[in-house]
Amino acid sequence: HCRMDKSRLPSPIALTINQYPIQNLTQSQSLRDMMVEISLFFEKHSSATIIAHNASFDFNFAHSHYFQTLATDDWYQWKHNNNVICSLELLRAIYLFKEKLTTIEIPNSRFAYPQFGLEGVSKKNGIFYQSHEAEGDVKSLRDLYGLMMNEAPDIVSLAHSCANKQEAKR
């Protein structure tokens, strides 16, 4: 958990959506301390593959906060080993290239467009964790990623290969 800067007021909409306790906003660790912890975690696990739903959002968020807090001078640490897989893009690829989905159900909008957001896809597939909070989102992604591996192991394997620039060049 991370406390907010005392100079900022929380958005009432964000408080409602995220259901984040006010106590955590005032008493948890500072943003800088959290970003140092995140940097050390990624440094320790630098060879691991990062799987994130909407990875560009997460990367931009981390990059921006690394810069703002000066927690590390390695602002691009997620991208050094070319090991980021965006499960949102992977899910779109599975939807596009797999003729018939048998394991994963994709919800549609009111206008019959497929919706690939983590919360909606998770609910459609019977995965229920607290959304918009780290632990719940990680558990949802873990379960959804398992469904993707069952649905299209060849596409998931290709995503892992393409995440590595050396493999992608072949």
Located regions from the model:
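Metal-dependent phosphoesterase core characteristic of DEDDh/y 3'-5' exonuclease domains
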Residues: H1-Y20, F42-C162
